[in-house]
């Protein structure tokens, strides 16, 4: 993978790293070193095989976080190394369990997260191991238990809040926006809100309009919140662990169709950088930016494109807020063409924000307008054939690349 942060004392860069004005830093929490690991050191390893060692209590600075060659080929697939195979939901569970072992302040709350193990079994076995006080079954009231988690974070705990379905978190939007995202700023920096909000979402199981929403478009405008989307067992575990260790509130998006995806992951402790994209396939002709389930639609299309003589570069952006413009920019400067593929709605979606960011920062490097393929602006139908029609299909990706590369 493009970046691994090793060691029990690992830390991730906070959003405040990007702000040079002191007043802006109040929007997000400053980095804080865990007293129990203060004497340890950690290694940041880049895909170019370079390594940097940092002492205890030091923050990963922006220039250090971004590897010198962010669009380099991955040195080795994790499946080729020693490790163990896990399904994606099992990788999430393993990452959560490891962090609960590591830090007694980590707790879990949500509907049926206890002895039932969660609606998709991400919290299976945690209640038996850690007890009902650290794995708390809540009433069916998202606004209440989300607010409870935020309050717990203000007192020093590190709650992981599960929405049984991401669509249900609309009922907690007031807590997520006015409290989770803004309390660090509105309290004058007195409180940090190290909360992880996670749960299943996306299109693909005929769950109907209410259970198939893509809430990343709703949450991206909330100040102070980071958003990441997992797409493999490897980055699911790494992002889960990094989100729990972050001093900022993080929303982790999980796709219902990816829970049973299997991959070999390392036995050693690792976390993924919350603000770094992953180079999935290096190429020369066009940059394709995607995330979550659409990563696999893009890779399916890439096989067809290669047979047609095209060489697409595929990047899983992973960080939906903030964007890794370093990795994206390096790719744009090389290929000069950009296609964005997302499952989010077209109007006000992640693709629209990413298009704006690319045009603002890399307009002079573009040989063609940025193209974005998104889901239809319609409620998700229940019928399977209609459901698939609303999201981007590989054939559409192939056609779009052919148009952009003419």
UniProtKB/Swiss-Prot annotation:
GO terms for molecular function: metal ion binding; pyruvate dehydrogenase (acetyl-transferring) activity. Gene3D superfamilies: 3.40.50.920, 3.40.50.970. InterPro entries: THDP-binding (IPR029061), Transketo_C/PFOR_II (IPR009014), Transketolase-like_Pyr-bd (IPR005475), Transketolase_C (IPR033248). It holds the Pfam family Transketolase_C. It is found in: Plastid, Chloroplast. It catalyses: N(6)-[(R)-lipoyl]-L-lysyl-[protein] + pyruvate + H(+) = N(6)-[(R)-S(8)-acetyldihydrolipoyl]-L-lysyl-[protein] + CO2. Its EC number is 1.2.4.1. The pyruvate dehydrogenase complex catalyzes the overall conversion of pyruvate to acetyl-CoA and CO(2). It contains multiple copies of three enzymatic components: pyruvate dehydrogenase (E1), dihydrolipoamide acetyltransferase (E2) and lipoamide dehydrogenase (E3). Tetramer of 2 alpha and 2 beta subunits. This is Pyruvate dehydrogenase E1 component subunit beta-2, chloroplastic.
